Amino acid sequence: MAEAGDAALSVAEWLRALHLEQYTGLFEQHGLVWATECQGLSDTRLMDMGMLLPGHRRRILAGLLRAHTSPAPAPRPTPRPVPMKRHIFRSPPVPATPPEPLPTTTEDEGLPAAPPIPPRRSCLPPTCFTTPSTAAPDPVLPPLPAKRHLAELSVPPVPPRTGPPRLLVSLPTKEEESLLPSLSSPPQPQSEEPLSTLPQGPPQPPSPPPCPPEIPPKPVRLFPEFDDSDYDEVPEEGPGAPARVMTKKEEPPPSRVPRAVRVASLLSEGEELSGDDQGDEEEDDHAYEGVPNGGWHTSSLSLSLPSTIAAPHPMDGPPGGSTPVTPVIKAGWLDKNPPQGSYIYQKRWVRLDTDHLRYFDSNKDAYSKRFISVACISHVAAIGDQKFEVITNNRTFAFRAESDVERKEWMQALQQAMAEQRARARLSSAYLLGVPGSEQPDRAGSLELRGFKNKLYVAVVGDKVQLYKNLEEYHLGIGITFIDMSVGNVKEVDRRSFDLTTPYRIFSFSADSELEKEQWLEAMQGAIAEALSTSEVAERIWAAAPNRFCADCGAPQPDWASINLCVVICKRCAGEHRGLGAGVSKVRSLKMDRKVWTETLIELFLQLGNGAGNRFWAANVPPSEALQPSSSPSTRRCHLEAKYREGKYRRYHPLFGNQEELDKALCAAVTTTDLAETQALLGCGAGINCFSGDPEAPTPLALAEQAGQTLQMEFLRNNRTTEVPRLDSMKPLEKHYSVVLPTVSHSGFLYKTASAGKLLQDRRAREEFSRRWCVLGDGVLSYFENERAVTPNGEIRASEIVCLAVPPPDTHGFEHTFEVYTEGERLYLFGLESAEQAHEWVKCIAKAFVPPLAEDLLARDFERLGRLPYKAGLSLQRAQEGWFSLSGSELRAVFPEGPCEEPLQLRKLQELSIQGDSENQVLVLVERRRTLYIQGERRLDFMGWLGAIQKAAASMGDTLSEQQLGDSDIPVIVYRCVDYITQCGLTSEGIYRKCGQTSKTQRLLESLRQDARSVHLKEGEQHVDDVSSALKRFLRDLPDGLFTRAQRLTWLEASEIEDEEEKVSRYRELLVRLPPVNRATVKALISHLYCVQCFSDTNQMNVHNLAIVFGPTLFQTDGQDYKAGRVVEDLINHYVVVFSVDEEELRKQREEITAIVKMRVAGTASGTQHAGDFICTVYLEEKKAETEQHIKVPASMTAEELTLEILDRRNVGIREKDYWTCFEVNEREEAERPLHFAEKVLPILHGLGTDSHLVVKKHQAMEAMLLYLASRVGDTKHGMMKFREDRSLLGLGLPSGGFHDRYFILNSSCLRLYKEVRSQRPWSGAPETSHRPEKEWPIKSLKVYLGVKKKLRPPTCWGFTVVHETEKHEKQQWYLCCDTQMELREWFATFLFVQHDGLVWPSEPSRVSRAVPEVRLGSVSLIPLRGSENEMRRSVAAFTADPLSLLRNV
């Protein structure tokens, strides 16, 4: 049977079921392709194949053993005659099949072996076997559990058994039949067969006559008392407790002994526990000895329903649901013996299905008292008259039937269910894992359930939530009840609690943390989705490889889709898609919206799907904006808005912008099979209802129908109401005052505030304005109480006005406002709702106070207009008064010596600074040709001008043209970075290919974007790699790109021209088309890269390497092809021709960069340039004032060189067995780290805090570690150590200090931590522990310090601290403790061996001369560093003397 089962099982599927898929390639290399070929494997053979982990080898061998071993058949007892009841339906007798005996007597060896049990399909009778002489068709088994990570294995044929099966169901008594009409739930239509309670499954092939229906439940109370003795109920109060109602006790069947029934009532807890509750309290005592008795009470686990409504069993599922229902084999009343073996039997409604044996207090209960997994039942035995036992691994359940016949029926049903379960288990991947009949849970763990003092063990398995008393019972397969999630719903209650709501009860759970609660919610929501869904459509759509991952964030197995965008998305992205609206994205579920998924729509997704969708919608997504599966909802929302509503990342069609041509192209495309073209045309604005020119087929949809293109028709129908993506254009606000009126007289109502003596920093509310009648005439602006008033409330003379400012709309309570500044340091604010009226007032006031000399300033829009004292040119002796107008980033000025206005481009200033003290400030504006000094004669209006000019001179946006620019239209950001790298990084190895620190790069780029002009890059403050990374990120993040979106594809197409002359000519044409700023930036950047590649012998960055780096950056592509890189490579190679560089300019450029490099090299060689040197304090042997040494540390100094220099200064000789080393000592952590002899010291000094210092002393344990490394084999180590996380608070107050045993494996690439699960009595059927590590760290990113700080209370004194630095330069640390000193040395030696590729100590230590400091590292200023003044503690961690006293005397 095993061979047949493995016939079609590949090694890859088998290893995946064992969670060892990483060895698939190893097996295939050794010619093992099918699972049957692995039968001869042994432990030695697996080791020879390269499988080094013993646990993995054992798992594979155990899986082989289980896969090819059939369990021994159950003992077959001798039969005895039993009278048959007439009301039991039985199949016709078959001579070849002897009757099934009761297992009460000894086995008769003369009888033939028990025949095999045929497989069962749903609730139908077992399938008949063919005779041995005929070919058996493929057997049909129940569907495998809905578990995505288990492989589906082929089913082997089962030996035949002739004759139809027997159905073991008792019919109701006469009294019970009278209750059927009122107990049927839900009521069935008249057309259905009576008593038809079987689930509606998929169509079945012809089969024997259907089974008689299941007996309707007895009308007893709805909810059971859980059969438990460990949990006492806490009375519930408040709104969270389920309501209790009084219900009538139902009469028991007349043929049975009357039983007392407890009902949910409003009685006190003591009343509920009295009387008849005693029996139930003793139910499980013998299975859990020593546990105090307590009752599971009805009120805590039930929510009563009206007595007129019968509760359907949870396994029945919702009507019409798609969840497969577990077929019921047998159900009826049985007497159950309490665990103590009492003679008082208790009546239970028992229900047996293919997976579980459950018993209830009544046949109306929704949830069982207890359930037993059929897979965990070892055998069933008869014990005396009418009694039988269900025996599991460590517990026996005793039942008593009404008669011997009924007992036999129950035993036969149980044996049949056990046999079927074992047959399925042998064929499932769970059996290969050693867990027969079990399903791996999606999530399992302990949760608090409201009303119980102890936690329950909860497991989410498939579409059910199972409740157990504890983990032990979970392993034994004996639980309390399970909840069918097809009728469940979960919702968050508070930070740690959530409710699972069903029609019968609300289960209120509490987790240990908010994160754990979120994980439980996700698992239960997944169970609900699985219960209500079918994966048929999803599996068909996932057949296309791109559809297996979310189109937006890349999450695996997405089960939602946008049917108009034709993309498959995950659940988290689907929620944000809904927020876009149906006009952008129509979201449907692959598993639940079954009616939507027609064959045509499925085929459309297979043709388009995520592959074509992302080639259009995500063609230009920069990596910095790409979504990840872990992205936050706000990030997803912004990304999806940009992607689908705005079309920010779409691939523009060549006809984009030409509506007529787009419509024509759409009409042509819909008649073909090119769906991607249709998608691109619609996404770029083609009209879906445009006129095609054919009256018979006027629309694209009609054309597609005429051409018989069903997929095109489906796509067009789904996009009938889809909006065309449109980018939100941020257009400058339109100004309403550009023409000067010939009159300066004006009147009307204005709203004004009281005059102020300082700038208006806060918004003035509408209530602060007063309505005044204002009159402008004769050079005076007067304002009155109303239009009839004669005396003005106040007036402003035009001659006293020094400045007129127009704030942006909606700055204050009124939509449009303007400010008037006077010589008396007063500010008047006026407002109006009408833009036209405000426009008129501004024009009139401006003409009233601007002299004719500066009338030209009024011909243009302005934001601020006025007069200021200034100094400029040759007249710096005295200040003059000039008129200035600010508009955007342009400051226009009219000076007395020249009547013509002169513009100043504020974003092109070389310098903008403020000089002088607070009383006499001067604004300095430096242009290439001149310097302008604007004085602050009046503080109020000068501060207004200062803020406005600074704002206008800063970057206005993210595009190139909005940046601060230089004289040649090159952005200052680009100029600063290129100039710095030219000065300091031309010879830096890997320049532009190496990345700087993320945090430093981000800070630098933010400061450059805010005000690049004020940022001066200095060699002692910024590293060249940080600057180069900032430049690359700036260019990549440009919204329109350096080559602009409109021309980007044209540039890429030009790179494919084969003729070099034609290609160069094409590049020159495209260069002219670029905007001026883009064109100047491209030339400056390519010129710089041309200089960089001239020193490729030193920096290793030739033209090809630079093209690889800058191609995707400049064209904002994903780098999948080399088109972008080819453009950059061509521009560098043809730099002289493309940019028309003459020979003289090229010669000067080469001479400049050569001189720069020579000067730096000469300065370094002569010792005149030591910008990279640090002066720091190093101690000899211990930290004392008399042992400190101040030493200059260049960038290239290693730890060995530092150690030798310190010893030279103190005249300390080095003996043969002396291992002098430089240690990094951290006083706060009470730990130290010996530096590797080749480790550079300068980077370490950068990271030292005030509580750290360097000490040169002997490494007492080095000799012992070298001896260990010389005698060991391999470069790995594994074993148990005590482990504690840095932020762990679990151990506070415990003797062990929060340290826990963990298993570690250290290899050449990483350090792995495994959680050790110990069990003195391992259960063979327990789920196998995952071999995935709990934590894993790259070995190169770890720093190991000897010692653990005392306040953590380490369990031993042999500990060390491990520090891990992430890619974002965030530090995390953990603490490890060994049991012995030698174990600590071995681990530490292995760390050093692996981290430094086997070179732990130099073979011949000598006094090496220090090399010349590297220029690329000499980028830090000369700063003296000293350690903390606090004295170091005498011990590290638990050491009582020297920090490495544990390593001495070796």
Swiss-Prot record:
Keywords: Cell junction, Cell membrane, Cell projection, Cytoplasm, Endosome, Golgi apparatus, GTPase activation, Membrane, Metal-binding, Phosphoprotein, Repeat, Zinc, Zinc-finger. The modification Phosphothreonine is found at residue 354. Changing residue 993 to K: No effect on regulation of circular dorsal ruffle size. One of its GO terms (molecular function) is type 1 angiotensin receptor binding. CDD domains: ArfGap_ARAP, PH1_ARAP, PH2_ARAP, PH3_ARAP, PH4_ARAP, PH5_ARAP, RA_ARAP1, RhoGAP_ARAP. GO terms for biological process: actin filament organization; negative regulation of stress fiber assembly; photoreceptor cell maintenance; positive regulation of filopodium assembly; positive regulation of GTPase activity; positive regulation of phagocytosis; positive regulation of receptor recycling; regulation of actin cytoskeleton organization. The modification Phosphoserine is found at residues 229, 428, 738, 1428, 1435. Residues 92-102, 200-219 have a biased composition (Pro residues). It is a peripheral membrane protein. The modification Phosphotyrosine is found at residues 231, 431, 504. Residues 225-236, 269-286 have a biased composition (Acidic residues). SMART domains: ArfGap, PH, RhoGAP, SAM. The keyword Chloroplast does not apply. A zinc finger (C4-type) spans 550-576. Residues 6-70 form the SAM domain. Residues 954-1139 form the Rho-GAP domain. The keyword tRNA processing does not apply. The record marks 993 as: Arginine finger. Residues 1172-1261 form the Ras-associating domain. Residues 327-419, 440-529, 743-850, 1274-1396 form the PH domain. One of its GO terms (cellular component) is plasma membrane. Residues 535-660 form the Arf-GAP domain. Phosphorylated by PTK6 following EGF stimulation which enhances EGFR signaling by delaying EGFR down-regulation; the interaction is mediated by the SH2 domain of PTK6. Phosphorylation promotes association with the Golgi apparatus and endosomes. It is found in: Cytoplasm; Golgi apparatus, trans-Golgi network; Golgi apparatus, Golgi stack; Cell membrane. Interacts with SH3KBP1/CIN85 (via SH3 domains). The interaction is independent of EGF and does not affect ARAP1 GTPase-activating activity but is involved in regulating ubiquitination and endocytic trafficking of EGFR. ARAP1 competes with E3 ubiquitin-protein ligase CBL for binding to SH3KBP1, preventing interaction of CBL with SH3KBP1; this is likely to regulate SH3KBP1-mediated internalization of EGFR. Interacts with TNFRSF10A. This is Arf-GAP with Rho-GAP domain, ANK repeat and PH domain-containing protein 1. The lineage of its organism: Eukaryota, Metazoa, Chordata, Craniata, Vertebrata.
